[in-house]
Design a protein with these regions (language model features):
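Positively charged n-region of N-terminal signal peptides that target proteins for export
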Residues: 1-4
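Hydrophobic helical h-region of N-terminal Sec-dependent signal peptides
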Residues: 6-10
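N-terminal signal peptide c-region/cleavage motif recognized by signal peptidases
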Residues: 13-15
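Active-site beta->alpha N-cap acidic-glycine motif
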Residues: 19-135, 235, 251
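Short, surface-exposed, polar/charged, turn-prone segments marking secondary-structure boundaries
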Residues: 53-55, 94-97, 120-121, 158-160, ...
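C-terminal domain-boundary segment and adjacent tail
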Residues: 59-61, 160, 211, 221-284
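Acidic carboxylate-rich catalytic motifs and surrounding loops in phosphoryl-/glycosyl-chemistry enzymes
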Residues: 69-71, 162-163, 247-248
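Catalytic domains of cell-wall/extracellular-matrix polysaccharide-remodeling enzymes
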Residues: 75-77, 84, 101-242
Length: 284
């Protein structure tokens, strides 16, 4: 009887511990840097400082992040950013050459674009090789299979997303503000942005239905996150999250955001303008 009692206690304790464990991988799309200009010394300096802020936030918080590169967006001088990212110990994956939406592009054109990026990034990509679909768009059944066959043939692992920050809509708002006012504006929208990311995280946890799965956050390399990434990471730590690598997250990932799932969620969240913006760019 005593052994049975201790077994029950052990099982109960293990279950509670599993429920308390919160783990998340941080993934950053659209490297080198969204909206960066390298055409003047001043612009180069600003881009360099913003990218350095991203690396600093990840390093100081000991985050084993993974970045995804748009190969066709690498301007002169930005290859150094990617080298710095890699040398800091972070992983780099393929995000296509031209950032095509597979729902609006043929499989053949899309595969050629991915392959073009694969060749250009061959010396930068880390192992294992990861691929992230732009817009998380995987196309219809036929296109999806063709692209997946290519990715498998070239040893790519698809990097899913379980928490989408939709940060691009917040980032767009920054560019409507005069340059000298942008830093203050970013601080002004910080509470709204952080609250939205946490709201998205809670939704992801709800989809997991109590299972001790691992989350994967999607953000972008942009001006918004160059200033607020440290705050995002602090928020997750305050809520008990531990940062893990994408490789670790894929051992037991939370339910990924997919087209069917997002289409269904639209029925529940049609009052959210940020979500409506996202749905509007995803059509088949």
């Amino acid at each position: 009887m005593r052994n049975v009692f201790f077994l029950i206690i052990l099982l109960f304790s293990t279950e509670c511990l599993a429920e308390e464990i919160r783990e998340i991988a941080i993934t950053i799309d659209d490297l080198p840097l969204v909206g960066a200009r390298m055409d003047t010394p001043g612009n180069r300096q600003r881009a360099t400082e913003r990218f350095a802020k991203i690396i600093q936030a990840l390093t100081e918080n000991k985050v084993p992040a993974t970045g995804f590169i748009i190969a066709g967006s690498i301007a002169k001088g930005e290859m150094d950013f990617l080298e710095q990212f890699k040398q800091a110990g972070f992983m780099l994956g393929n995000h296509t050459y031209s950032h095509y939406n597979l729902n609006q592009t043929s499989a053949e054109k899309y595969i050629a674009d991915v392959d073009r990026a694969d060749k250009k990034l061959s010396l930068l990509l880390t192992e294992p090789k990861y691929f992230r679909y732009p817009y998380l768009a995987e196309g219809n059944k036929q296109k999806k299979q063709k692209v997946r066959d290519y990715l498998a043939e070239h040893q790519y692992i698809i990097a899913p997303v379980t928490v989408d920050s939709l940060d691009f809509r917040f980032n767009e708002r920054i560019y409507r503000v005069p340059y000298r006012e942008r830093e203050n504006y970013i601080q002004k929208i910080k509470p709204e942005y952080l609250a939205f990311i946490w709201k998205q995280t809670l939704r992801a946890e709800k989809r997991a239905k109590g299972k001790p799965v691992k989350q994967i956050l999607l953000i972008h390399a942009n001006i918004l996150n160059s200033y607020l990434l440290n705050d995002i990471l602090k928020m997750y730590k305050e809520h008990g999250y531990t940062f893990i690598s994408l490789t670790d997250a894929l051992t037991n990932p939370a339910p990924a955001i997919t087209f069917p799932a997002i289409t269904e969620e639209k029925q529940e969240h049609t009052n959210d303008p940020l979500e409506e913006d996202l749905f509007s760019i995803w059509g088949d």
